[in-house]
Amino acid sequence: MATYIVGDLHGCFDELQLLLKQVNYNPAQDELWLTGDLVARGAKSLECLRFVKDPKNNAKTILGNHDLHLLATLLGVKKVKPNDQVDAIFAAEDRADLQNWLRNQPLLIQHPKYGFLLTHAGISPEWNLTETIACAREAEAVLQSGHYADYIAQMYENTPDHWSAEWQGIERWRYIINVFTRMRFCYADKRLDFACKLPVEDAPNELKPWFKLDNPLFHQQDIIFGHWASLMGKADKPNIYALDTGCAWGNHLTMIRWEDKQIFTQERLK
């Protein structure tokens, strides 16, 4: 049995299949975990959703910001972005089933055997492990509730940019969602920054990657994330694994086999 974790798909279904072929993936014995953002920029977002949803493939994902945006567009509260290739999802006969399945996916997974944390964008530098898990479950409960559409319609803001246990309602939920699905850089005081999308070496001096801030969790815990393609897999910390390597942007799809930490890649198909 092997445990495989793959970075952001963004509709790159054929590349995923070639990666799995490289390792002779056997869903009867092996596990496949994904860092979210199954959909958007690649041509086969529908196929990605159906593959991960199908129990026979033994695949599990967490939610990314593009997955949440897809939910918002399916609900009619946001428009499809010009470069997103999701028309096939809107036309699919199983659209409602896919929508319901997607909103029931987690924001955070702790692997039951190995204990690593799987998140799309990151973990707040202000949270310990207990808070991290509790906040994920809290936000997931909203997405799985009957009033999730009201919250999704209000998630498109950058505030609050810091954590307070006193936050309630949409502000609290929005901070949690932004941490798990959008975060990249933070200030030294642990406030979130959403303006900078530059590579780390080109970012202003006052900004640091979230995983470089002072939080014991970032030293004690194995953390796997996607979202940040410009890192190109380099987090420069032995227990932090960045798996989004921009396949949808013309680079490659990355997968790690957890047992021996071997990396497998598949170049973007033309």
Swiss-Prot record:
SUPFAM superfamilies: Metallo-dependent phosphatases. It comes from the Bacteria. Its EC number is 3.6.1.41. CDD domains: MPP_ApaH (cd07422). It is an enzyme of class 3 (hydrolase). GO terms for molecular function: bis(5'-nucleosyl)-tetraphosphatase (symmetrical) activity. Pfam families: Metallophos. The keyword Aminoacyl-tRNA synthetase does not apply. It catalyses: P(1),P(4)-bis(5'-adenosyl) tetraphosphate + H2O = 2 ADP + 2 H(+). Keywords: Hydrolase. Belongs to the Ap4A hydrolase family. Hydrolyzes diadenosine 5',5'''-P1,P4-tetraphosphate to yield ADP. This is Bis(5'-nucleosyl)-tetraphosphatase, symmetrical. It comes from Actinobacillus pleuropneumoniae serotype 5b (strain L20). The gene is apaH.
